[in-house]
Amino acid sequence: SEKNAPEESSSCSKSEIQLDFSLSAAQTTAYEEIHKAFENHNPVLLQGVTGSGKTELHIALAKEALTRGRNVLYLIPEIAVSRQMEERLGRIFGNLLLIFHSKETPARRLEVANAVRRGPYIVLGTRSSIFLPHHDLGLVIVDEEHDTSYKQDAPAPRYNGRDTALVLAKIHGGDAVLSTATPSLESLYNCRIGRMTKVELTEKYYGAAESDVEIIDTSADRRKRGMAGSFSFKL
C-alpha cells in the first residue's frame, strides 16, 4: 500500500532486491567479521565513526537475510528518523518495507501486523514494533543502540527495547546487530565478557568529509559582550 514505502518505491520481491551502492574495503572487512560472529551465534556490536557507512552494512545484511527467505526487523530510536530511513530503504526493498510507529493510525498499524503475518517483510520501526507478530526473523538491527529512547519507563510494560530485541532474535534463531558511534556501557561490557562480538568501522565511507569542530569559550565572549542571549555570535 501507499504508506509502506515512499511513492517512488516499486513493487519488489526478495529475489529482485538490488543494492544502489557498493561496499568499501573497510566495510567489506567488517561485513566478513560480522558473518564470522554470526557463525558463532554471537550478536554483534557494530561501532563506527559518524559517516563510516554503518547504514550500508545494515542494508547489505538485510538484503542477505531476505534473500535467504527470512524476515528483518530494523529498529530506530525515534519517529523523526523514520522518514529519511523510509526513503532510503524504500528505494531498495520496495513493497517489502513496512513502517510501524505510534504516529501511524490504528487501522494502518493493523494492516502492518497482518502483512507481518504473511511475510516476507522488513519492518522499519520504533521500539513498539518489537511486539508485532513476527515470524522467522533472520536479522534484528538496533540502530543507535545507545539511545535512551529504547527504554520505556511508563506506562507499562516497562522494558528496554534494545535488550528485548536481542531476546527476540534469539527466540527466532536469528542474528542481531547493535549499531552506534557511541556504544552503551552495557554493550561494551557484553563484548568484554564475550557475550557479543565487537566490529569496528574506523574509516569514513568513500572519503566522506570530516566534521570541523571548534571549541568556543562563551565565558570570554560574555566578558567581551560577544553574545546574543545564550549564544555566541559564532554560533
Regions found by a protein language model. Give the residues of each.
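Pre-Walker A segment
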Residues: S1-I76
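Short acidic loop-to-helix transition motifs that present clustered carboxylates
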Residues: T50, V81, K103-R109, P183-S184
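Short beta-strand-centered segment that lines the nucleotide-binding/catalytic pocket of NTP-utilizing
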Residues: R70-R83, S102, L201-E203
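SF2 helicase catalytic motif II
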Residues: S128-V177
